[in-house]
Amino acid sequence: QMIQAMLADMAQQTEAARWLTYACAAKADAGAKNVTKIAAMAKCFATDVAVKVATDAVQVFGGYGFMEDYPIAKYYRDAKILQIYEGTNQVQRIVIARNLIKEASQHDHYNSVIPDEFQDSFGAAKVTANV
């Protein structure tokens, strides 16, 4: 039953990553002015899911998951490199955070939501959030 639960989780995560990617593509196709944040989210989430699913697949296959006779080991290596290509996931997270800060700073209630002691930090982040 545990393997069934892992397979279900793997399918759910893969489907969620797929739909986030579709949402990004749909925004771009519709001519959205800025898809930077959702593109970074899609890349980061989908590649994290790919590594998690590949890792779980290695676990499901047990010792065979590490053997080169089976494709699982290659899938894991391929998934891992996806987190590095076209900007590491850490860089993608910075892009996402800067866009979130930029969006938050454009709202009137920005100053009322950010405590005074953090205003300088967020103000500095706001200036560098021009992505």
PLM segments and residue spans:
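Alpha-helical interface subdomain recognition
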Residues: Q1-V131
